[in-house]
């Protein structure tokens, strides 16, 4: 447990984002280099370690590596040393856990019925590193028949592992909304097309659409207007749509676009909604 904690805290201090994670990758390679495994670098700063146990098949265990663009204000002695970046989603813990597995394999404390491939994936929070890693043929080359992953869940009691049949983690989609209106002085607002008003209507209706459904439809960023005394002529919104069910996902996106068209007609604004589809549910 001491080594797990030390690894987690060391990794917590050096959070990096995206697919270029030189410090994180160096830490992992340094720890794994002492073990009887083959180190691999299939894509960008991904780190993989292959433990050959002389079996025909291989099982893979995967951890994400990247952090979030969040400023840490915990005041902890092992807090982030990189301003504006933080392991706020538990990936430091995931890496420490997989390193712990590697140490047990190296020490012969466990003898699986298959070879073991450990995969540390960059860019999980952004573009996703899994697809480009798979595209290298890594899984086929090492005869991987199954891949296991996990995610820390602070709401669960200590020592409890939760799972279920079917989808566990949702499909994701990055939503972007551009609303274009016409700016006039606030005193003559009725002569303009208020992009901020349109955004407010759109937000409240989209949130109402998702209420009570097994999904997430929320926006985390909105930028609008240029002056306190002028009607906004442009609003930019960024959000996320996540669902466990593909049918619900498609229905919500169709209804969201219909709401956007209705708001545009009501306000005289042009409402453009785009959906960048992310990875499928797991």
Where are these regions (language model features)?
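Alpha-helical scaffold segments in soluble metabolic enzymes
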Residues: 6, 10, 27-30, 100, ...
């Amino acid at each position: 447990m001491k080594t797990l904690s030390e690894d987690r805290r060391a990794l917590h201090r050096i959070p990096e984002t995206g697919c270029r994670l030189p410090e994180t990758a160096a830490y992992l390679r340094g720890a794994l280099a002492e073990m009887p495994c083959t180190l691999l670098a299939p894509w960008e700063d991904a780190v993989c370690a292959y433990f050959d146990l002389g079996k025909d098949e291989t099982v893979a265990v995967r951890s994400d590596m990247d952090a979030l663009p969040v400023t840490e204000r915990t005041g902890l002695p092992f807090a982030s040393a990189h301003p504006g970046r933080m392991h706020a989603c538990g990936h430091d813990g995931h890496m420490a856990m997989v390193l712990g597995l590697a140490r047990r394999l190296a020490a012969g404390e466990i003898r699986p019925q298959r070879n073991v491939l450990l995969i540390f994936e960059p860019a999980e929070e952004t573009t996703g590193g899994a697809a480009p890693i798979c595209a290298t043929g890594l899984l086929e080359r090492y005869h991987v028949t199954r891949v296991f992953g996990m995610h820390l869940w602070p709401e669960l009691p200590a020592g409890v592992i939760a799972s279920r049949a079917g989808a566990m983690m949702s499909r994701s989609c990055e939503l972007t909304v551009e609303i274009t209106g016409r700016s006039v002085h606030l005193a003559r607002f009725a002569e303009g097309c208020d992009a901020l008003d349109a955004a407010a209507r759109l937000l409240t209706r989209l949130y109402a659409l998702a209420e009570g459904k097994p999904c997430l439809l929320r926006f985390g960023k909105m930028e609008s207007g240029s002056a306190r005394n002028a009607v906004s002529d442009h609003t930019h919104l960024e959000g996320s749509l996540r669902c466990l069910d593909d049918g619900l996902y498609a229905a919500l996106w169709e209804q969201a676009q219909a709401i956007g068209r209705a708001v545009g007609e009501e306000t005289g604004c042009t409402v453009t909604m785009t959906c960048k589809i992310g990875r499928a549910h797991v």
